[in-house]
Design a protein with these regions (language model features):
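Phosphate-binding and adjacent anionic-ligand microenvironments
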Residues: 1-135, 142-146, 153-158, 165-171
Length: 171
């Protein structure tokens, strides 16, 4: 598994995300692909060509002072009450509200449970395999925004992600 701070956990023999284990796995992959006559980069391009060029990013908004926590909660409440129908070039298809354990299809109004533990997280499923997610930090006076898209090339995915991130910031 991976985490935002780029930790890597392979297997169940260690509980800490460890750079040594990650480097060992990377070296093992490089050695394997060398026997296949390709580099790690070649294989990465093979994966992109097969599955698409996915790209993700994040940004944060800081809310300092005594009223910071209230402003963050107000922002989360506003997203829940006034779910955007469109974010930039992308139509919002579904909203996953983990705090209220509900997935809402915005076209039909149908709902289903998330089936996951409750958490103050909103995940917006967008058309064309794009998405964004918003949540307050558990340790800092910040709201974190995550986004991801699928493009047809490295350049296309970078351009689409930049446009989506800008649309989220201006929403």
């Amino acid at each position: 598994g991976f985490e935002e701070s780029y930790g890597c956990l392979i297997g169940t023999h260690a509980r800490d995300k460890d750079a040594v284990v990650a480097v060992m796995a990377l070296c093992e992959a490089a050695a394997y692909y060398k026997t296949q006559g390709i580099t790690l980069w070649d294989q990465m391009l093979n994966i992109y060509n097969k599955y698409g060029y996915y790209k993700e990013d994040l940004f944060t908004m800081t809310f300092k002072g005594a009223d910071g926590a209230k402003k963050m909660q107000d922002m989360m409440d506003a997203y829940r009450k006034n779910t955007p129908k469109q974010v930039g070039a992308y139509k919002v298809l579904r909203l996953r509200d983990y705090k209220n354990d509900v997935i809402t299809d915005l076209a039909t109004g149908e709902t289903a449970p998330t089936g996951l533990p409750k958490s103050n997280v909103l995940y917006f499923e967008l058309e064309n395999d794009a998405w964004f997610c918003v949540r307050p930090s558990g340790t800092e006076p910040k709201i974190k925004f995550y986004a991801g898209i699928k493009g047809t090339s490295l350049e296309d995915s970078a351009k689409k992600l930049d446009e989506l991130m800008e649309a989220i910031k201006n929403a």
